[in-house]
Each structure stands twice: as structure tokens, then as C-alpha cells.
Amino acid sequence: DEFVRVLNANHKTAVEPLEVAKNESFKQQIVETPVVYIAPYEAKQITLTKQSIKGEKYNPEIAPIHSLYNEYFGGGMNAIVFQEMREARGLAYSANARLSSPLKLSDSYIFRATIATQNDKMMDALSAFDSIINDMPVSENAFNIAKEALITRLRTQRVTGSRVIYNYLNAKELGLDYDINKIIFEQIDSLTLEDVVGFQQEWVKDRVYKICIVGDEDDLDMRSVKNYGNIERVSLNQLFGY
């Protein structure tokens, strides 16, 4: 009530405000058939993104294990993706992967993985990426680092200023009347590496993907790319309108 009083006193509006135009929301598409989109870009390296949407709606009960999986698998330089794709195998300049939460109840979870690599390493990188996504390497040391990093971030982060109202609005879009980070923090310490593996098996393994490649088709192994889905070429005109 105090917030509303202060807002009304200081935020002046027209006597008859204009009607807000209805926003056309982007409708997510369930990925049922594998497709490879390629956009032309003449360079000796490519950027490749895999995206999968199965239609799973928001579930606050999985938030703790979901957050820990993301931290363990694709959260940073100590995560499995970076260590395997860049440090151990030298197959990517950069690599990341995560299962993203919906922003509103009508949306779905999205698994998205991205790599940047040399043209001649693309197929090796894609094969290796598929391997670790579906058969996730298990490391107790990496798990402990991920758990500690997540706990530390939750313990030290602060919601201040305008972020207070935005966090409230974001939670409201998901039907929440509480801070989900509090639940994550309270439960994270009891989760195990076996829990992360179980989550990966249920939520990530063997998904169907749409793959987007930005690169020079003439310098890529397109015959092998076809194994990942029907190829659809996207022109610069389609992307930018000219």
C-alpha cells in the first residue's frame, strides 16, 4: 500500500491514458524433426547452436537440481563442457550448454548448446558435443566445484534497486509468490552427483535438435552435416531483409 501511495504521488499520468497496444508474443515451436539451418558467412571458423524444445512446462520443484546441473555441465571454465571441448580435446574456441527455464507459464524449457570452432574441426566438435551431452562425463571433483560455486553465488548475490520490482514481476509470470532462489539455496547442499546424473538422463539425454550454423558452406563437410537433419539454407535477405 505504501508503494502504491508513493507511486501515485510521484508518477504523473494523463487523465485518460492511451490504451497499450497488444504485444504479439513469440510462439515457441516444439522440435519434433531434426533440421540444420545454415547461414552464409565467409570465415575459417563457424558458430553452431543446437536447440531443443520438447514442451515441458515450468516446474519449480526441479529448480534446485536444474540449477546444479547447469552449473556442473555448462556453468563456466570448470564445467564439463569447457573442460571437455576446449581444454581436453581442443575442439572449440568457446563452448557452452544449458537447460534454460521458461520466462512465463506458457513457455517451455529450452536446451541450447553453442560452440565456435574451426571449419575443419566442425564435425569432430559436433560429434564430441553430442557425446558429452547424451553421455555426460561424471567427475566428483567437478561436481564439488560446481556445488560450491552455486552456493557462493546464491549466498552473496543481492537484489536491490529496480531489480526488486523486476524480480517480483518475473516470479509473477511463473505463478510464484516467493523467491525461488531461497528454495534452491536451502536444498542445494543435500543434492548429490547421482542426482545430477539422474536429471541429465531424464531431461537432457536423446533430445531432438534444430541446428543453426553460421559459416562458409564451401569449406564445410556438408555430406556429414546431412546426417544431423534436412539442410535448409537461410539467405542474408531472409535474415536482414536486403
Regions found by a protein language model. Name each.
Residues Q45-K57, F82-D135, E140-L193, D206-V214:
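M16 family metallopeptidases and their MPP-like homologs
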Residues I30-P34, I62-H66, S108-I110, I180-N181:
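Flexible glycine/proline-enriched surface loops and loop-helix/loop-strand junctions
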Residues N78-A79, V164, Q238-G241:
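A C-terminal, polar beta->alpha supersecondary segment
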